Amino acid sequence: MSDAEEQEYEEEQPEEEEAAEEEEAPEEPEPVAEREEERPKPSRPVVPPLIPPKIPEGERVDFDDIHRKRMEKDLLELQTLIDVHFEQRKKEEEELVALKERIERRRAERAEQQRFRTEKERERQAKLAEEKMRKEEEEAKKRAEDDAKKKKVLSNMGAHFGGYLVKAEQKRGKRQTGREMKQRILSERKKPLNIDHMGEDQLREKAQELSDWIHQLESEKFDLMAKLKQQKYEINVLYNRISHAQKFRKGAGKGRVGGRWK
């Protein structure tokens, strides 16, 4: 064993002896008053002291780098929001353009349908007018033939029956004249309906005008029917009064002959 090792061994021996003596020594009881003083009072809460975090030695915290990274993160989030906004705006603009195209296409389809319906209605009106004209021509031709036949019959008949037939023909001619007058009045009041050049608003106004006109005609018809009914009632009342008065007049005209009424 070397001299250094012997010296260390000798130093360790007294230290071990002192530790054994300390363990063998009995612990002295602390006074009760000291223990009570050492207890924390319940009325005052104990606040632990604030200890600043320890920065490990050998490591350097770069606050500029932290700030730069945070700024880069915020900038990236802002750029993402901007990209999302412009993408959404582009999508909305595309939807708006598609909607406008659909509206224009639908408007063109409606215009084409309206043009087709107008053309069909014009053809139908032309056919109706042609059919009406053909029927009128046939009726006029038939009427002329009937008139020629009747005139021929009248010229061959005798004078006795000729006057009667002439009067009948004159009455019939008067009725035809009244019918022709009625047709003329209706043709004057019946205005042609030209709606080819009208737009949607003008058609709506025209329909409202026709509806108001129909209501007015119905009102006038109702008033005339009521007036006609009242006139018929007054005529019947007057006729009954005249009949009743004539009965009394016939009774008053009888005379008394030989004590008896005849």
Curated annotation (Swiss-Prot):
Residue segments, region Disordered: 1-59, 107-153, 165-197
GO biological process, one term: regulation of muscle contraction
Key word Transmembrane helix present: no
Residue positions where Phosphoserine is found in the record: S2
Biased composition (Basic and acidic residues): 32-41, 107-149, 177-197
GO cellular component, one term: troponin complex
Sequence ranges of Acidic residues compositional bias: 1-31
Keyword Phosphoprotein: yes
Protein keywords: Muscle protein, Phosphoprotein
GO molecular function, one term: tropomyosin binding
Subunit structure: Interacts with TPM3.
Family membership noted in the UniProt record: Belongs to the troponin T family.
Role noted for this protein: Troponin T is the tropomyosin-binding subunit of troponin, the thin filament regulatory complex which confers calcium-sensitivity to striated muscle actomyosin ATPase activity.
Protein name, UniProt field: Troponin T, slow skeletal muscle
Species, as recorded: Sus scrofa (Pig)
Phylogenetic placement of the source organism: Eukaryota, Metazoa, Chordata, Craniata, Vertebrata
Gene name of the encoded protein: TNNT1
